[in-house]
């Protein structure tokens, strides 16, 4: 009688039990997969951390200047959480190696800056696109109202601005060490400016002995604009219009400066044609601009008059150059030397360069290690570095070759700075950059390298057999005045 009976809910409960039974392995497998993923993530992060540590002992491959801001702490996709770099626009980064297509390994150039993960240009572009999509979805009332309230720009102008915005890369490749360039107080090639700058060159050569390369550059570096070097059409126009400095010579000089900077020594350029910061603003050199500034135009006039009639004939052009420099905003320069005494100005510059030296040299790796030409293949077309062997070009050998004449003249000028009087100057400028340093642009061999010279304490020793070199110094400039 019970065979045909039906118990309500029995079949349903059986089915339910079967369903619940078969669903348990699915839940267990989900948990297992989650654990596997977490384990794999920890393994990848551990390997990334190890690679980060190994990178501390690797040389700098190249350097970049940032055009955007980035906060690595907020980036959840960083290979090691909390190990992303933070930087603002116009900061400098030393790149050690490539970790992946989205990440590099390097450090922010600052004191105490540690090795960290740096987003690649592809990564930054991806972030920018996501932010734009998010902004379009959410809508920005303030921006919409602004657009409605103002007149639309002409189509051509709008397209031009859009094109410029689209073509600004997140990074610009720059020398691993920013080259130091002196400007002021007036035009190079005239005695007052040359003497004051030569005093600083001599000081730097001995203060940073073994850590500095001082090299002469005669090519017009103002032609080394990124837009020109990357545009064959503009390059041809400039080569036709420039009688004194071809673009090929400029390109060669840029490559030489990049090569010098790879050693992570301080690089100082005795650049003949650079008299204003705007001349290098659009180049890839990212220089440290040092403004040698006198206290007033009257002081500069007195200094020029003290050099005799040959310099007085060109007083007007020198004063015009001085006016252009003092009209520049302070942010145009990295260092302004406005001290009234040479020793104070030298110490000011030395303190700045010591801080920069510590910022560019991470404690772990050796400061003199040379990096490979390029660790990132994707940036080879952006870099201005050529494949160069160990041999220097004739111009480079000439610039870096120690010159006995130049060295002895520098020592004599430096030694005499504490002995000669500055009676030609007014009392308010009594000890300011004593009138002792003759124009240094007579040397065809350029300034010698800091390496291999006598230590600074030997500069105080008198060497009477070379006194006649100082007295018989030739004042004739080797180049026409109109080239300045």
Curated annotation (Swiss-Prot):
Q: What Pfam families does UniProt report for this protein, alphabetically?
A: Guanylate_kin, VGCC_beta4Aa_N
Q: Does the keyword Calcium apply?
A: yes
Keywords from UniProt, A to Z, are: Calcium, Calcium channel, Calcium transport, Cytoplasm, Ion channel, Ion transport, Phosphoprotein, SH3 domain, Transport, Voltage-gated channel
- The SH3 domain, residue ranges: 59-128
Bias regions of kind Basic and acidic residues — which residues? 388-399, 463-484
Record's subcellular location: Cytoplasm
Q: Note the SMART domains from the entry.
A: GuKc
Quaternary structure, per UniProt, is: Component of a calcium channel complex consisting of a pore-forming alpha subunit (CACNA1C) and the ancillary subunits CACNB3 and CACNA2D1. The channel complex contains alpha, beta, gamma and delta subunits in a 1:1:1:1 ratio. Interacts with CACNA2D4. Interacts with FASLG. Interacts with CBARP; prevents the interaction of CACNB3 with the alpha subunit CACNA1C thereby negatively regulating the activity of the corresponding calcium channel.
Q: Which family does it belong to?
A: Belongs to the calcium channel beta subunit family.
Q: What is this protein called?
A: Voltage-dependent L-type calcium channel subunit beta-3
The species this protein belongs to is Rattus norvegicus
């Amino acid at each position: 009688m019970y065979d045909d009976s039906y118990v309500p809910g029995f079949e349903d409960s059986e089915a339910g039990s079967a369903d619940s039974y078969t669903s348990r392995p699915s839940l267990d497998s989900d948990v297992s997969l989650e654990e596997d993923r977490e384990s794999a993530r920890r393994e990848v992060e551990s390997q990334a951390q190890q690679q980060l540590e190994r990178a501390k002992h690797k040389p700098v491959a190249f350097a970049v200047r940032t055009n955007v801001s980035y906060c690595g702490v907020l980036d959840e996709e960083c290979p090691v959480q909390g190990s992303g770099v933070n930087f603002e626009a116009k900061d400098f980064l030393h790149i050690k190696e490539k970790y992946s297509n989205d990440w590099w390994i390097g450090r922010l150039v600052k004191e105490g800056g540690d090795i960290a993960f740096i987003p690649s240009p592809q990564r930054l572009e991806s972030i920018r696109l996501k932010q734009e999509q998010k902004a379009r979805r959410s809508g920005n009332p303030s921006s919409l109202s602004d657009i409605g309230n103002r007149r639309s720009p002409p189509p051509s102008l709008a397209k031009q601005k859009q094109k410029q915005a689209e073509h600004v890369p997140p990074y610009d490749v720059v020398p691993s060490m920013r080259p130091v360039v002196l400007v002021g107080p007036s035009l190079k090639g005239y005695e007052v400016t040359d003497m004051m700058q030569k005093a600083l060159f001599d000081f730097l050569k001995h203060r940073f002995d073994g850590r500095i390369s001082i090299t002469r550059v005669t090519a017009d570096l103002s032609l080394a604009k990124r837009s020109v070097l990357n545009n064959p059409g503009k390059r041809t126009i400039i080569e036709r219009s420039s009688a004194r400095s071809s673009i090929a010579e400029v390109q060669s000089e840029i490559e030489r400066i990049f090569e010098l900077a790879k050693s992570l020594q301080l690089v100082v350029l005795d650049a003949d044609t650079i008299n204003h910061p705007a001349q290098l603003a659009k180049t890839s050199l990212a220089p440290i601009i040092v403004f040698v500034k006198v206290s007033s135009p009257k002081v500069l006039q007195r200094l020029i008059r003290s050099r005799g009639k040959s310099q007085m004939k060109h007083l007007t052009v020198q004063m015009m150059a001085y006016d252009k420099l003092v009209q520049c905003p302070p942010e145009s320069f990295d260092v302004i030397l406005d001290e009234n005494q040479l020793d104070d100005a030298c110490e000011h510059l030395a303190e700045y360069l010591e801080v920069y030296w510590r910022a560019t040299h991470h404690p772990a790796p050796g400061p003199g290690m040379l990096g490979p030409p390029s660790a990132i293949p994707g940036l080879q077309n952006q870099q201005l570095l050529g494949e160069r062997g160990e041999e220097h070009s004739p111009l480079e050998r000439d610039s870096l070759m120690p010159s006995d004449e130049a060295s002895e003249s520098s020592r004599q000028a430096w030694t005499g700075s504490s002995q000669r009087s500055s009676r030609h100057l007014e009392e308010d400028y009594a000890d300011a950059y004593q009138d002792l340093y003759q124009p240094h642009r007579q040397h065809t061999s350029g300034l010698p390298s800091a390496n291999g010279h006598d230590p600074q304490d030997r500069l105080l020793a008198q060497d009477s057999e070379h006194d006649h070199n100082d007295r018989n110094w030739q004042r004739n400039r080797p180049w026409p005045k109109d080239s300045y």
